[in-house]
Amino acid sequence: MQNFDEIIKKFPKKRPDLEEKYKLIFDEWRLLNRNAVGTANTLAAILESWCHKEIAKDKFKGNILEIGAGTLNHVKYEKNFNTYDIIEPFEKAYKNSKYLNKINNIFTNYSEITNKYKKIISIYTFEHMTNLPYEISEIKKILDKNGSLHIAIPCEGEFAFKMGWKFTTAIAFKFKYKLDYSVIMKHEHVNTFEEILILLRNYFKKVEVKRNPFILPIKNCSFYAYIKCS
């Protein structure tokens, strides 16, 4: 296992460049993926719903901030919030969402935020962040002293997760675009489960981890994980 000092030296990371043929289909693929269009994406969304439900179990009456809210597909799971704000720079992802009317403020970066939040959410976003230590530091600034950070991440870097996308999404991607899905994964998922967890344990006093029970809730046998930090 890596230690914190080894991991922190890797940041900021540089995302691998995509060849032009991948760039041409990238936005289309991202929207299809986020909207769970197609059998493989639908199956992934069903498995991912476990994390949405786990995050929503933490009920309270207060203000929520979601980082990387995408298509706003988590909003329907939260029932008791006063206001729901988001950080999402990709406007195409949410502009046609039926949950848009439930959103109070839409931010593109942390500098626009003046509030503190009791509950901050980030779902399948931390694996994409090229400067994750900076992101975590900014999150701590806007997290209420009695608040908590709730994140969901894939078990990137582990056997089950890799086999999962290789035999579902990768096949569908190859069939549709005649391209190698592993190129997209290397471009998109720049952080592993292990790296994310070690960073979080350095920045927060209490870090609770719960793995998806499918296939088994242990290393190399689970696809996704829910992490609560306070």
Model regions: which residues?
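Short linear sequence motifs
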Residues: 4, 15, 19-22, 43-45, ...
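S-adenosyl-L-methionine-dependent methyltransferase catalytic module, highlighting the catalytic core
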Residues: 6-21, 32-34, 38-42, 130-141, ...
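Class I SAM-dependent methyltransferase Rossmann-like catalytic core
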Residues: 23-56
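Conserved SAM-binding loop
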Residues: 50-161, 225-230
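Short linear sequence elements within intrinsically disordered, low-complexity coil regions
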Residues: 4, 9, 16, 27, ...
